[in-house]
Curated annotation (Swiss-Prot):
Residues 401-553 form the Helicase C-terminal domain. It comes from African swine fever virus (isolate Tick/South Africa/Pretoriuskop Pr4/1996) (ASFV). InterPro entries: Helicase/UvrB_N (IPR006935), Helicase_ATP-bd (IPR014001), Helicase_C-like (IPR001650), Helicase_Restrict-Modif_Enz (IPR050742), P-loop_NTPase (IPR027417), Phage_T5_Orf172_DNA-bd (IPR018306). A motif (DEAH box) lies at residues 298-301. Its EC number is 3.6.4.-. The keyword Kinase does not apply. It is an enzyme of class 3 (hydrolase). Residues 178-349 form the Helicase ATP-binding domain. It comes from the Viruses. GO terms for molecular function: ATP binding; DNA binding; helicase activity; hydrolase activity. Pfam families: Helicase_C, ResIII, T5orf172. This is Probable helicase A859L. Gene3D superfamilies: P-loop containing nucleotide triphosphate hydrolases. The lineage of its organism: Viruses, Varidnaviria, Bamfordvirae, Nucleocytoviricota, Pokkesviricetes. Keywords: ATP-binding, Helicase, Hydrolase, Nucleotide-binding.
Length: 859
């Protein structure tokens, strides 16, 4: 007799995707006893068994499986509504956690004879198991929806294969990702959906194929898809190991390969192979051993969540070896275990925006349609019923809008939960709308049938669900998505938006519908609160949308309003105002430094450096998307964040942004340190005085030296000593009122440097004081003995008239106005310099063009 845990199936149960879970001391006889044959036909069979040494061990596995699958168990029955592969993986995980030895048998047939029919001794109905040990294995409905979404792709859609091409951005992503891996051992590639992350991963892992590589994916279908792509790229199957619970053989041309979940075989293969590529599901990752040179985590936002060991976090939290590459379109930052943790995830080494993919032609474009709240003929008695009736009408309005351009549109409706999906479905069907519903509590065959019906429909059709098709499932013909409930997670929002963005020949733009509690009679900013998280998420992926929010008259965007009886333009203006300033309408949320689109702001910084040959000045302005901004504010934020990053402190900058900055000329010296470096200038001053017999000769403390990257040492020293002269003994404020004890404003260390250097030559650099205040007349003019700096400035002014050769040698371009305008002459004359930012007391801001003919370019 053989004891064991089993999962059995009967055609009557299989039709409902139900599977019988049990344990027995006699696997050969179990399916032939009365409890199986009295009410069912003789068609029972095992899906799989875990043979154990004792019946008690088998009972513990059963109890553990039923505990972990509690959300998918039929009440008071040992029936579970999960895929057999899912139950198998769960059973093995339970057995491993409980330290129970077993032998896995797939679809076994045990020989039945008279000797096998034995009355089994009864065991306590509730064996003692450590639920704490198994808590991380509990399957939640949300997790299963995502898992099912991964698997349904394989059964339901065929991906269109295209010729292999290395796009320019893919090469750049691979290079930057690999360099970051070599630098820090961890890197994130954030690339929009459908933009070729797998190809980039292949280009990177090619550098590690002499060793061992692990490629983790969140589901069986993605495992197959990843294998197919890597095979297409040139990976040989002889050095590939697939770890997953689907035993179906995969055939690729003349090659074939199978998955496995045999822990002994897996460990032996990994340890003994000199080179190996392992492709595994996160769910099977507990079977792996820590011996990889590179670990790639695809769709890595799935790892985030609670800080606990579970299949999705097993490798991240427990493996110590190897570099880590994380791939995602939507990083997750809102959970205890999040991608903000740079020790675990590293930083973003490369980013490719959704808008870039659209403009390059790899992703379908889309329009936004906000849907006004319609008036109800009869007011329901409850708020919940009112909301439901309004959303139903808004869904019908959205479908009608699609039908004006598309014969048989398909629309996904994302709901708050399964309860809302059921309620909306019932109401839509009652009103004659062709609607379908799919969610994780339905039998799998029903879901697949519904999904197939939706995909193949030749009529306008709606499919309601909560999270089932939020990501992973591709519907090439999908035309629109409708958010029946607000979403707050940027990840959820962007993944949902991307569902209808498959690129197909002659496919019209997709539509994203956002229902609002707004009509022409109840317009107020609070009514727009539900779209603010949506707008924030979209603006981070689509710089054009961000610019449109700042100035719609200059930057067009496909956004409109349906169901409004008033002025659509006024309603859109209110919506944009709520998004930009919040529902209180007070603070400009979009122009904070960290919100400015990096590519646009960095492009202006790069232009200033490469064209103007300098870094930004304090009063440089920036005109972006209709906003008048002081560029120095963003520039200072960048420097602060850069220094935090280099000091390994929490920083807002990602590695790819740091790489951008360090690509600029003299970034670490002039960009971070400023145009007038103190130590460098003091070294030059000390050498100069030694070579010129202690004479400063001439110095310009009026124009402030020259801030350009090509500045001479004397020009930089002029800037430093201009600052010293301005700070030395400033005792008056702007309104000429005395400010006691605020006289000497030079930092002590810098004062010591000046004392030491000038003191060697008995030169006086400090201004005279009386009782701590400068010697000044009633008009604030200095009346003390001139300092060596002031005397050198007098000489400079004389040399401008009498010794122009000397001036040109040490202050080249002075005669052409370079120092006066702090711009290269040709930059000034052609108006290429950044505009000057000016703020007025009334709150208005102005950018004034720097050129021979000053003119306002923006009020």
């Amino acid at each position: 007799m053989c004891a064991g845990f089993y999962v059995a199936v009967h055609p009557w149960l299989e039709a409902q995707s139900l599977h019988k879970v049990g344990h027995t001391g006699n696997l050969a006889a179990r399916l032939h006893d009365g409890s199986y044959t009295t009410c069912f036909t003789d068609e029972w069979k095992y899906c799989f068994t875990l043979e154990t040494s004792t019946k008690k061990d088998a009972q513990k596995i059963e109890a553990g499986v039923l505990y972990c699958a509690q959300f998918f168990r039929v009440k008071n029955k040992e029936l579970v509504c999960l895929l057999p592969e899912k139950i198998k993986q769960l059973a093995e995980d339970v057995a491993n956690c409980l330290d129970i030895s077993y032998t896995l048998c797939d679809s076994p047939a045990y020989e039945m004879n008279d000797s096998t029919i034995v009355v089994e001794p009864s065991l306590p109905s509730d064996p003692l198991i450590s639920k704490e040990k198994l808590r991380h294995l509990v399957i939640t409905p949300v997790e299963d929806e995502e898992h099912f979404a991964d698997d349904v792709l394989f059964f339901s859609t065929d991906e269109t294969r295209t010729a292999i091409e290395d796009r320019l951005y893919q090469k750049e992503a691979a290079n930057m990702g690999y360099q970051e891996l070599r630098r820090s051992g961890r890197a994130i590639l954030q690339m929009a959906c459908r933009c070729g992350k797998t190809r980039v991963a292949y280009l990177i892992l090619s550098n590690y194929l002499q060793g061992k590589v692990l490629y983790l994916v969140p589901g069986l279908s993605l495992l197959r898809q990843t294998l197919e792509k890597l095979y297409q790229y040139g990976i040989s199957l002889k050095n590939v190991l697939l770890v997953g619970s689907d035993q179906t053989r995969i055939v690729l041309n003349h090659d074939n390969i199978e998955m496995t979940t045999n822990p002994v075989f897996i460990a032996k293969r990994i340890r003994e192979a000199p080179s190996l590529l392992v492709i595994a599901t996160y769910q099977s990752s507990t079977l792996l051993v820590d011996d990889f040179d590179l670990i790639i985590s695809d769709e890595c936002h799935r790892i985030c969540g609670e800080w606990e060991t579970r299949p999705f976090t097993h490798v991240l939290l427990n493996f110590k070896k190897g570099h880590r590459l994380f791939l995602t379109a939507t990083p997750r930052y809102d959970t205890p275990l999040s991608m903000k943790n740079r020790e675990l995830f590293g930083g973003v080494a490369f980013r490719y925006y959704l808008r870039e993919g659209i403009e390059a032609g790899y992703v379908n474009d889309f329009e936004l349609q906000m849907v006004a709240a319609p008036k109800l003929a009869h007011q329901p008695s409850t708020k919940e019923e009112t909301t439901k009736q309004i959303i139903v009408k808004q869904i019908i309005m959205a479908l009608a809008h699609l039908k004006t351009n598309i014969t048989a549109p398909k629309m996904l409706v994302f709901t708050r939960d399964i309860k809302q999906a059921k309620e909306l479905y019932a109401e839509l069907v009652d009103q004659g709308v062709y609607a379908l519903i799919a969610h994780s509590t339905l039998p799998r065959q029903v879901i697949l049938k519904t999904f197939t019906e939706f995909c193949s429909s030749k009529e306008p059709v709606i499919l309601l669900n909560c999270r089932l098709f939020q990501e992973g499932v591709e519907v090439p013909e999908l035309n629109a998505v409708f958010f029946a409930a607000p979403r707050h997670s940027p990840r959820d929002i962007i993944q949902s938006i991307c569902r209808p963005l498959n690129k197909q020949v002659q496919k019209p733009h997709a539509t994203i519908f956002l229902p609002l509690e707004v009509n022409t009679e109840n317009v107020c900013l609070d009514r727009f609160s539900s779209i603010i998280p949506f707008a924030d998420a979209l603006a981070s992926e689509d710089p054009r949308f961000y610019e449109h929010l700042l100035n719609p008259s200059e930057v067009a965007y496909p956004i409109n309003w349906i169901g409004a009886h008033g002025s659509v333009s006024e309603l859109l203006q209110l919506a944009r105002h709520a998004i930009r300033y919040g529902t209180q309408g007070k603070i400009d949320r979009l122009t904070r430094s960290e919100r400015l689109p990096w590519k646009a702001a960095f492009a202006e910084l790069k232009r200033t450096v490469e064209i103007c040959c300098r870094y930004p000045k304090i009063n440089d302005g920036f005109h972006f998307g209709g906003a008048t901004l002081r560029f120095d504010t963003w520039y200072k934020w960048v420097i602060k964040s850069y220094l935090q990053y280099k000091n390994k402190e929490p920083s807002s900058l990602e590695p790819y942004q740091v790489s951008d900055l360090e690509s600029l000329q003299d970034w670490t010296t002039r960009g971070v340190g400023g145009p007038y470096p103190w130590e460098e200038s003091m070294a030059f001053l000390e050498t100069w005085l030694a070579q010129n017999k202690g004479e400063l000769v001439a110095i310009d403390i009026h124009q402030g030296g020259w801030i350009g990257l090509d500045a001479t040492p004397m020009e930089r020293l002029s800037g430093v000593l201009t600052t010293v002269s301005q700070r030395d003994g400033r005792s008056y404020g702007k309104n000429k009122k005395l400010r006691p004890k605020k006289g000497f404003m030079i930092p002590p260390q810098q004062a010591q440097d000046l004392d030491r250097i000038f003191g060697k030559h008995n030169l006086k650099w400090r201004k005279d004081r009386v009782n701590g205040f400068l010697k000044e007349d009633e008009h604030g003019n200095y009346t003390g003995e001139p300092t060596c700096i002031q005397e050198a400035y007098r000489t400079f002014k004389e040399y401008v008239k009498t010794n122009p050769e000397y001036i040109e040698k040490y202050w080249p371009g002075y005669a052409k106005g370079k120092h006066k305008h702090q711009e290269l002459p040709h930059i000034w004359e052609k108006g290429l310099a950044p505009p000057r930012y000016k703020a007025f007391k009334d709150g208005n801001k102005q950018l004034i063009q720097r050129s021979p003919k000053k003119k306002d370019i923006k009020n």
